[in-house]
């Protein structure tokens, strides 16, 4: 026989950051090409994204080229195509990889909040992004121009910016001037005057050239000078009018210098003496002086010494005007030694008198249009410009141009530039000391170049992902950890810097602990997921549709290949940078193609397809409803299922359902086939024949089908599956037609009706699954709801009306006397005969003999009642009762309690059959005439309108305000509506058989509110509103909050039978539409609430029978704002006692006199027990005097004090064993005592107990009386008090099980009224129990057409949300400079911190109300009340610790701080609020479900002082972990001495670092060093508390100094936060914020121990609950041979 057993294979799952080597190890090869498949052959391209060599063959067991085909070649690698022969399934598993040409940062670690990279490197995220994406920094700074480079590598005129200048200045000596940047120079340069041009050039201080264009307008005087004259002035010299230009001089005659002949040139006025041909002399030329006469003739011979000219006198030339001397261009002069000039030939000397002159400096590079000496007119162009735009001028140059061109150009002293930035990745320690720079500092590229010039090869900086990688590689985590810990010790714990450091320290510790290397956050290799997870499919028309991922991978590969090529070519840095940035963006898009709208800091553009749809990245594949977690891992499609419309199956038993034949054949096809084949041959031909038998629906097939489904069960499910009763098992019955038939009684749990609802059918396949479905899920065994322990599968509508009709009587029945009754019968059978013969009717009064509790009695009743009672268990029969909905429900519940689930199920079937039959017999119809309008109605309306008229008159006269007028009118109409409702009900009740009255009164359909609208009055209507508006003021009317601002003060005074007018119809539309809108808007919200609840509680299962705790919670009535939300009997039901319940008077264990049951610890309380305990009250003495015998070995079983002094103990001391010992020492054997029997009991009178004066409350309802209160009672002369026992019950809130809860603390499994089984998934049940009504309530519109006063579900849901998300509704608002916490509803409630009395309520000098509380000791505590809050207490009232003194919302963390560590007071307050919201909607949910959720919300604690644990202050840690850590610390402290001996001689596994008093890090020992006694002593002196040593090739940690335990505070988390802080990362990631949860878990190397249910569903194994528990794992299920054959075929 085949066996099957369910062993759980996976114990835990760890997540870590993948190293490049790990990614490569996953891979089947590198993807080098972006191609996917060949467009002609449709085969994958080699080395492409679908390559068969990398990812596996496309065809099963066939290589790409077809050389190897078939399974026999499995594992062979084809030498031709390189493809390994294997199953095509490999393409779902095998991965590839892309080797990146440049590293790229993993965006999750950059963009997470807080950023992991930013925290670890202590860098700003914006700076990090700038580095990674090769960004720049905007710098506004001055510039300088080098004027004297001295011995530096600068050139004169080089521009240096301020940042660089500061760097160079520290090391080099050179001169600079500040630079000015030219802006908007006007051009061209125009002459302002007429005149002559003079051009001059000169060099500036920066070595650049300036051309001076000088334009002069001059008066010029010409003076001729003659040869021989001596000019006494210099060119350019200033002279005065009349000043000599040449001096007067006598000119000697000229003589021949040698023999020869003369030549006279009259034109040039010269005499040339030429020597004789025989002579060696050269010819000599003489200029004839002005005024001399030539004495020789042309050609004349002369002798040496002959006179050639006469002597003469040259007169002086005088200046005719004042001005500047200018030598003419024709003037030929010779400079003399005395500085004068001799005129060699006639010429001109000019004197220029400047009338006007303009200078135009022009910078080098400008085009000059004029030449020297040119004459220009005013307005002529001199040059194209004088300066260039953006030209840098030194301050000297700037002054020149500023003085010559004022207002013709602007300058900027500072320049604004975007400078590329780099991060320092390595720096010489000396340079670091000198410059103050360190690794990780960001500088601009200019600064880096400056540092490089000064410190060549001593500083390295870079940008991009490679820079981040270097920084991460350079981190020494151990050293960083020691540094951070040392720095934290110096800072105040609450400072923001300390918080930042703590966050960083946690990350460092996480990296150390997990063994992850920080540089792995920068990718060198990108994994390529298997191709079958990113398929490409051919669509109509031959085109291909591909997954977005392929497009993202393609883009990445293209950019990667392009960058690699550019690197090989040695492309310029700027091109490479751009390409690297694009590669980084491609990797980003692949991992997370996110957008800013998702709350990310992303500066990236989102990649979109041609239709503008963002491409789905790997992150999108994981997160959200359609992500991998929620869609594929937590929700799976199920085979062997069908779906069809449901119809009612009145003939079915409760555990049966009707399945259409066709559907059943399809569902059970493999089983039918197996059965058919089991009878004959299994050959292929035979198989085809048998298949044809099924497909052609031959008679044999139906016979086999009938046989197959016998004994099987199927699961029926109706969406939405809100709780476990939405899936139940039924025995299938084959039916004709196409609809599934459903038993009408199981409609309520499914929330099904027959207006077109559909249901799904599932077939459990294995014998184990069938057994589980039958015994655990059969509808017969799921009648009782696990939410409240009462029946949920109940008769409705027709069945109710049938039963009601059967048991109702005429209105005269009760007044009818026995003697007046005509029909008398000796037995029910006789009566039935009379009925069938037509003598009597169902409702005819009869006298009949029936058996009641074994006795024959004659009773007055009707045949209908006899018929109905005949189906009931004998001791539950009641012949004088009308059985309406409530009565039938109570009957089913009582039957279940007394006789068990089977009898209850049978009763339901019987009631169903009876109900349907007699509903048909009743012939129920509905007509207008059945709507009876009360005759008094018109008179009442007339009277009311008159009153309204008087109110309006008073308003118009000014006697009433607008608010008062509205309030009065609303109150008036509310009263009238109520009065007419009562009258309508009475009018209908006159005829007990009125169809409408029967429907409403029986509870079958509708309610009196609807009848009131049909036949009475519609009443006031409500307006639409925002339920969270702060403006809503509500008033209480008959226990109901009425929002006056939201109510029309004009009523609809008509009813629907007579019809409404247009205005009234219009008014009605508001509320009617509001109902529809609320339903639509809030359904999703309620679903989200359920989802959060499930996520929080899913791991809570019953893990052990008893945790052994003695803690518990006090049983009480839950009272909120004076309204009883839950009575104590409901509170007690299903609980287990935490301690014995003692009789208040005798102090002995309480016993139920009826059942004899004793209420000791660990007793489970049933309904009857709860009722008994809740009603048990006694009058007990406050004080009793007695004399006790102290020779007995027991003390009184109540609080007692000595009534006489004993030794050193005074009168009034509590009686203890120490007092008894002292008395015995004195030789006493009896002591007088005063006993207080009331101490330890609970005050049970709902009216407070006052003091003698009647001013102060001494006791309030449900107060536990302690000795202080007892003495107060005694002082005030109170002798007896009505009390009840103090009952402490166990609760999930106080359970001490490490994981989940124990069976004793959970108590009763409400679905079967037995103690809960170990393994029960109580968390899921709790979440479903709370969430299901929330969803249901939104889907039913509770507003009856928007009529005022109907309960409003939205406000209920808001309350639920406020309770489960306590901090989401807190708003810190600044008002008047102060921070105030406000809510949607008012302000913060003031909490009382002591037990005491309200002494006084007064107003202080600022006008604020102050409440003074006097405690028991007489101390006064003052509470100032916020302006918006209203006082809830009154003078003399008793208040207890944790009570609210004012209106407003409770700030939960304040309440938590008021109480003990348990958080019970907080939970009970939350419970009151939330129960109230549900109770108002008529929904019953047991408290334990809320307690489980609150337990999870209170499961985290805030670390105040981490002691010597690895936690950080302000870190949220599971309470379980803290308690475990503290336990381990205390155990470790006990082993310190032993450990010190043990470590001697062992080798250190890590180096040991500590910090000195100066703040320097010191290495105490190196890795591998042996631990000696001296070294150990050194460790202890340095305060090292634990060391890691190597022991048998393992690293073991030993504690060598005592550690401090953790100090903490309990914290209340919201549902969302509790779900995200769940210890298992798989469940948290599947909930919300997937990327961040996975990021944080990977850094930590988090291990998910698979404790919860979700995690196990995700990994695909049985959940650790129910039959999935390890206890059941070894059970082997034997299956029948038939089932085995079916299994094989299936």
UniProtKB/Swiss-Prot annotation:
Gene name tied to this protein: rpoC
Lineage: Bacteria, Thermotogati, Thermotogota, Thermotogae, Thermotogales
Record's function text: DNA-dependent RNA polymerase catalyzes the transcription of DNA into RNA using the four ribonucleoside triphosphates as substrates.
Annotated Zn(2+) 2 binding sites: 1107, 1295, 1302, 1305
Cofactor note: Binds 1 Mg(2+) ion per subunit. Binds 2 Zn(2+) ions per subunit.
Domain of life: Bacteria
Any one GO molecular-function label of the UniProt entry: magnesium ion binding
Record protein name field: DNA-directed RNA polymerase subunit beta'
Family: Belongs to the RNA polymerase beta' chain family.
PANTHER family given in the database record: DNA-DIRECTED RNA POLYMERASE, DNA-DIRECTED RNA POLYMERASE SUBUNIT BETA
InterPro entries for this protein: DNA-dir_RpoC_beta_prime, DNA-dir_RpoC_beta_prime_bact, RNA_pol_asu, RNA_pol_N, RNA_pol_Rpb1_1, RNA_pol_Rpb1_3, RNA_pol_Rpb1_3_sf, RNA_pol_Rpb1_4
Amino acids binding Zn(2+) 1: 63, 65, 78, 81
Gene3D superfamilies, A to Z: 1.10.132.30, 1.10.150.390, 1.10.1790.20, 1.10.40.90, 2.40.40.20, 2.40.50.100, RNA polymerase II, clamp domain (4.10.860.120), RNA polymerase Rpb1, domain 3 (1.10.274.100)
Database matches in SMART domains: RPOLA_N
EC numbers, comma separated: 2.7.7.6
Native source organism of the sequence: Thermotoga neapolitana (strain ATCC 49049 / DSM 4359 / NBRC 107923 / NS-E)
Quaternary structure note: The RNAP catalytic core consists of 2 alpha, 1 beta, 1 beta' and 1 omega subunit. When a sigma factor is associated with the core the holoenzyme is formed, which can initiate transcription.
Co-factor requirement: Mg(2+); Zn(2+)
Tagged with keyword Cell cycle: no
């Amino acid at each position: 026989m085949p066996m099957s057993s369910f062993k759980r294979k996976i114990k835990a799952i760890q997540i870590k950051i993948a190293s490049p080597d790990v990614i490569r190890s996953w891979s089947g090869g590198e993807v080098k090409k972006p191609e996917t498949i060949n467009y002609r052959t449709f085969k994958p391209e080699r080395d492409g994204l679908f390559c068969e060599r990398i990812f596996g063959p496309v065809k099963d067991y066939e290589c790409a080229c077809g050389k190897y085909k078939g399974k026999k070649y499995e594992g062979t690698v084809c030498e031709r195509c390189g493809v390994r022969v294997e199953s095509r399934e490999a393409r779902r598993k095998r991965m590839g990889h892309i080797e990146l040409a440049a590293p790229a940062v993993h965006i999750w670690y950059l963009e997470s909040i807080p950023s992991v990279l930013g925290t670890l490197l202590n860098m700003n995220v914006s700076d990090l992004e700038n580095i990674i994406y090769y960004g720049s920094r905007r710098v506004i700074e001055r510039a300088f121009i080098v004027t004297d480079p001295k011995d530096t590598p600068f050139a004169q005129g080089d521009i240096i910016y301020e940042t660089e200048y500061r760097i160079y200045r520290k090391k080099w000596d050179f001169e600079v001037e500040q630079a000015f940047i030219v802006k908007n120079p006007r051009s061209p340069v125009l002459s302002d005057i007429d005149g002559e041009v003079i051009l001059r050039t000169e060099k500036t201080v920066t070595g650049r050239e300036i051309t001076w264009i000088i334009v002069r307008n001059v008066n010029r005087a010409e003076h001729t000078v003659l040869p021989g004259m001596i000019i006494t002035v210099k060119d350019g010299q200033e002279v005065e009018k009349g000043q000599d230009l040449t001096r007067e001089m006598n000119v000697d005659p000229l003589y021949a210098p040698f023999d020869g002949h003369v030549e006279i040139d009259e034109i040039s006025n010269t005499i040339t003496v030429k020597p004789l041909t025989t002579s060696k002399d050269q010819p000599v030329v003489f200029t004839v002086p002005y005024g001399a006469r030539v004495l020789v003739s042309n050609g004349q011979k002369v002798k040496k010494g002959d006179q050639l000219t006469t002597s003469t006198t040259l007169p002086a030339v005088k200046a005719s005007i004042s001005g500047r001397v200018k030598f003419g261009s024709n003037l030929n002069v010779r400079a003399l030694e005395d500085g004068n000039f001799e005129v060699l030939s006639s010429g001109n000397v000019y004197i220029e008198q400047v009338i006007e002159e303009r200078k135009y400096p022009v910078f080098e590079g400008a085009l000059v249009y004029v030449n020297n000496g040119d004459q220009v007119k005013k307005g002529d162009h001199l040059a194209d410009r004088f300066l260039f735009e953006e030209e840098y001028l030194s301050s000297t140059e700037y002054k020149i141009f500023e003085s010559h061109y004022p207002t013709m150009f602007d300058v900027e002293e500072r320049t604004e530039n975007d400078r590329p930035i780099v991060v320092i990745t390595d720096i010489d320690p000396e340079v670091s000391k000198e410059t103050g720079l360190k690794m990780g500092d960001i500088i601009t590229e200019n600064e880096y170049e400056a540092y490089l010039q000064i410190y060549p090869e001593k500083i390295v900086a870079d940008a991009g992902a490679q820079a981040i990688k270097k920084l991460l590689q350079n981190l020494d985590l151990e050293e960083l950890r020691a540094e951070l810990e040392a720095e934290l010790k110096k800072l105040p714990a609450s400072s923001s810097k300390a918080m930042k450091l703590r966050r960083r320290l946690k990350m460092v510790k996480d990296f150390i602990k997990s063994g992850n290397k920080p540089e792995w956050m920068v990718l060198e290799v990108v994994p390529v997921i298997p191709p079958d997870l990113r398929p490409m499919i051919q669509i109509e028309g031959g085109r291909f549709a591909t997954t977005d991922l392929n497009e993202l991978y393609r883009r990445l590969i293209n950019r990667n290949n392009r960058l690699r090529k550019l690197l090989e070519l040695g492309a310029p840095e700027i091109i490479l940078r751009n390409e690297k940035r694009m590669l980084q963006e491609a990797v980003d898009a692949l991992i997370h193609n996110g957008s800013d709208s998702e709350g990310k800091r992303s500066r990236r553009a989102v990649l979109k397809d041609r239709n503008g749809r963002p491409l789905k990245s790997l992150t999108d594949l994981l997160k959200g409803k359609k992500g991998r977690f929620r869609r594929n891992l937590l929700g799976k499609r199920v085979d062997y299922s069908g779906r069809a419309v449901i119809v009612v199956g009145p003939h079915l038993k409760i555990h049966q359902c009707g399945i259409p034949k066709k559907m059943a054949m399809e569902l059970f096809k493999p089983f039918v086939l197996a059965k058919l084949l089991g009878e004959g041959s299994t050959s292929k031909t035979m198989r085809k024949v048998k298949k044809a038998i099924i497909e052609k629906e031959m008679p044999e097939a139906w016979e086999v089908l009938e046989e197959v489904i016998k004994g099987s069960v199927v699961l029926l499910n109706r969406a939405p599956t809100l709780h476990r009763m939405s899936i139940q098992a039924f025995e299938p019955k084959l039916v004709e037609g196409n609809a599934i038939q459903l038993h009408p009684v199981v409609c309520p749990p499914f929330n099904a009706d027959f207006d077109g609802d559909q249901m799904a059918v599932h077939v459990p396949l294995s014998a184990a699954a069938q057994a589980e479905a039958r015994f655990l899920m059969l509808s017969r065994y799921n009648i009782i709801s696990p939410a409240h322990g009462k029946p949920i599968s109940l008769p409705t509508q027709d069945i109710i009306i049938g039963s009601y009709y059967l048991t109702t009587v005429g209105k005269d029945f009760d007044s009818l006397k026995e003697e007046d009754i005509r029909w008398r019968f000796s037995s029910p059978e006789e009566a039935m005969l009379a009925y069938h013969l037509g003598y009597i009717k169902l409702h005819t009064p009869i006298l009949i003999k029936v058996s009641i509790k074994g006795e024959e009695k004659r009773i007055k009743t009707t045949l209908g009642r006899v018929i109905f009672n005949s189906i009931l268990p004998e001791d539950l029969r009641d012949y004088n009762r009308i059985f309406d909905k409530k009565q039938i429900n109570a009957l089913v519940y009582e039957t279940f309690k007394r006789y068990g689930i089977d009898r209850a199920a049978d009763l339901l079937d019987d009631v169903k059959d009876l109900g349907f039959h007699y509903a048909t017999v009743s012939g129920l119809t509905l007509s207008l005439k059945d709507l009876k309008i009360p005759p008094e109605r018109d008179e009442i309306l007339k009277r009311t309108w008159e009153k309204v008229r008087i109110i309006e008159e008073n308003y118009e006269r000014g006697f009433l305000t607008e608010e008062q007028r509205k309030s009065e009118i609303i109150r008036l109409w509310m009263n009238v509506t109520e009065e007419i409702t009562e009258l309508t009900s009475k009018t209908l009740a006159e005829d007990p058989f009125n169809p409408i009255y029967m429907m409403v009164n029986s509870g079958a359909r509708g309610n009196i509110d609807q009848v009131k609208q049909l036949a009475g009055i519609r009443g006031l209507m409500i307006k639409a509103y925002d339920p969270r508006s702060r403006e809503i003021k509500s008033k209480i009317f008959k226990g109901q909050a009425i929002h006056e601002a939201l109510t029309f003060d004009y009523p609809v005074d008509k009813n629907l039978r007579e019809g409404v007018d247009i205005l009234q119809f219009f008014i009605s539309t508001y509320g009617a539409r509001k109902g529809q809108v609320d339903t639509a808007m809030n359904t999703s919200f309620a679903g989200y609430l359920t989802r959060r609840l499930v996520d929080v509680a899913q791991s809570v299962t019953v893990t052990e029978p008893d945790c052994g705790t003695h803690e518990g919670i006090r049983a009480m009535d839950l009272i909120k704002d004076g309204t009883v939300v839950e009575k104590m009997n409901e509170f007690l039901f299903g609980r287990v006692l935490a301690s014995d319940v003692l009789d208040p008077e005798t102090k002995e264990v309480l016993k139920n006199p009826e059942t004899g049951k004793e209420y000791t610890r660990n007793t489970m309380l049933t309904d009857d027990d709860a009722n008994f305990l809740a009603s048990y009250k006694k009058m007990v003495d406050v004080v009793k005097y007695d004399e006790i015998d102290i020779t007995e070995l027991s003390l009184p079983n109540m609080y007692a004090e000595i009534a006489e002094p004993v030794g050193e103990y005074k009168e009034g001391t509590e009686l203890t064993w120490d007092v008894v010992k002292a008395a015995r020492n004195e030789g006493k054997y009896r002591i007088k005592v005063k006993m207080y029997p009331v101490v330890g009991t609970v005050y049970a009178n709902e009216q407070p107990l006052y003091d003698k004066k009647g001013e102060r409350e001494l006791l309030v309802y449900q107060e536990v009386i302690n000795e202080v209160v007892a003495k107060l009672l005694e002082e005030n002369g109170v002798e007896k008090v009505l009390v009840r026992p103090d009952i402490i019950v166990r609760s999930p809130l106080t359970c001490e099980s490490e994981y989940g809860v124990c069976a004793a603390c959970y108590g009763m499994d409400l679905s079967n009224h037995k103690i809960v089984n170990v393994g029960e998934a109580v968390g899921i049940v709790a979440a479903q129990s709370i969430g299901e009504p929330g969803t249901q309530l939104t889907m039913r519109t509770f507003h009856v057409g928007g009529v005022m006063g109907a309960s409003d579900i939205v406000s209920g849901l808001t309350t639920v949300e406020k309770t489960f998300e306590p901090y989401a509704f807190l708003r810190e608002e600044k008002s008047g400079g102060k921070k105030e916490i406000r809510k949607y509803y008012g302000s913060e409630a003031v909490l009382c911190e002591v037990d005491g009395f309200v002494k006084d309520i007064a107003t202080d000098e600022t006008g604020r109300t102050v409440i003074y509380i006097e405690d028991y000791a007489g101390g006064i505590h003052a509470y100032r009340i916020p302006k918006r809050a209203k006082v809830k207490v009154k003078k003399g009232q008793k208040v207890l610790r944790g009570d609210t003194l004012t209106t407003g919302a409770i700030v939960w963390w304040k309440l938590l701080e008021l109480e003990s560590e348990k958080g019970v007071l907080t939970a009970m307050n939350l419970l009151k609020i939330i129960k109230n919201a549900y109770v108002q909607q008529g929904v019953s949910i047991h408290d334990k479900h809320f307690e489980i959720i609150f337990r999870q919300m209170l499961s985290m604690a805030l670390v105040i002082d981490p002691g010597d644990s690895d936690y950080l202050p302000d870190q949220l840690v599971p309470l379980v972990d803290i308690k475990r850590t503290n336990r381990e610390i205390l155990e470790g402290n006990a082993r310190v001495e032993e450990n010190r001996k043990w470590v001697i001689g062992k080798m250190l596994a890590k180096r040991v670092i500590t910090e000195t008093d100066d703040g320097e890090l010191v290495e105490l020992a190196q890795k591998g060093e042996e631990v000696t006694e001296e070294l150990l002593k050194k460790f202890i002196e340095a305060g090292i508390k634990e060391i890691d040593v190597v022991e048998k090739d393992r690293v073991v940690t030993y504690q060598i100094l005592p550690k401090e335990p953790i100090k903490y505070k309990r914290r209340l988390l919201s549902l969302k936060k509790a779900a995200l802080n769940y210890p298992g990362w798989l469940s948290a990631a599947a909930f919300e914020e997937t990327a961040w949860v996975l990021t944080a878990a990977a850094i930590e190397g988090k291990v998910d121990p698979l404790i919860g249910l979700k995690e196990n569903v995700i990994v695909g194994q049985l959940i650790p609950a129910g039959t999935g528990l390890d206890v059941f794992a070894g059970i082997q299920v034997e299956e029948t041979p038939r089932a085995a054959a079916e299994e094989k075929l299936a």
